[in-house]
Amino acid sequence: MNDMNPGFVMPDVQSSHDTRQIPIQRVGVRGVRYPMSLQTPSGVLSTVGTFNLDVHLPADQKGTHMSRFVALLEEEREPLNLAQFQLLLEKMLEKLEADAGRIEVSFPYFVSKTAPVSGVQSLMDYEVTMIGEVRDGHTTVRVKALVPVTSLCPCSKKISQYGAHNQRSHITIDAELAADTPVEALIRMAEEEASCELWGLLKRPDEKFVTERAYENPKFVEDLVRDIAMRLNEDDRIVAYTLEAENFESIHNHSAYALIERDKRRAG
């Protein structure tokens, strides 16, 4: 029953004509986990990416070619930087015969850090996402980094005789870049403007430093986004950004949140 005649041509259902005449803005695959490598200032970093890939489907085409998305990843062997990621996006459009599409890949990004007093080394992990999109003939590539930090409440410090409440916070920078900017640059901006940065491994002298550093540098969630926004505004490598801060309040069962968006190509 499964035998095929030598001259048999398997039908390509996806490429057949669709009579409903409704275009689909985005169709593809999501949650594809694949090994990948990144070109970083310190060398090539191996990690695992979770990919979402999709393209625009014309109104007269029944379906896209789903297998080609995974085939694209299987063929990709070059370490990714922004330029290579944009090339991957162009390859996808060519392979899928599409005029618009989007690739999003999220991955853990590890940075070796040195403790502030003891000097012990440890790895710190960050959640990084690269997003590339072609629409109306225009290509955009963005990098998003989620940076965990410590924040300490200025009000609590002011009104308390002993100490002040502090908590872990998440800074998220989603930036469109004019140049191949290392993701570490975005991470450092967030860490340097927090009450204190985090480390994977600390000794007792380091804990003392972290506690006192945060106490000497209290910041509301509003302070966090404003101070980081000043850094982003001054950096010519950054064309546009969405900046978010969320403080997981230690004295409440809710978070404090702030957001700033700016596109430098627009006035104001």
UniProtKB/Swiss-Prot annotation:
Any one Gene Ontology BP term: tetrahydrofolate biosynthetic process
Record keywords, A-Z: Hydrolase
Keyword Hydrolase: yes
UniProt GO molecular function: GTP cyclohydrolase I activity
Site, as annotated: May be catalytically important: 153
Keyword Transmembrane helix found: no
Pathway(s) this gene product operates in, as recorded in its UniProt entry: Cofactor biosynthesis; 7,8-dihydroneopterin triphosphate biosynthesis; 7,8-dihydroneopterin triphosphate from GTP: step 1/1
EC number: 3.5.4.16
Role, per record: Converts GTP to 7,8-dihydroneopterin triphosphate.
NCBIfam families tied to this protein: PRK13674.1-1 (NF010200)
Family that this chain belongs to: Belongs to the GTP cyclohydrolase IV family.
HAMAP family (alphabetical): GTP_cyclohydrol_B
Name recorded for this polypeptide: GTP cyclohydrolase FolE2
Taxonomic lineage of the native organism: Bacteria, Pseudomonadati, Pseudomonadota, Betaproteobacteria, Burkholderiales
GN (gene name): folE2
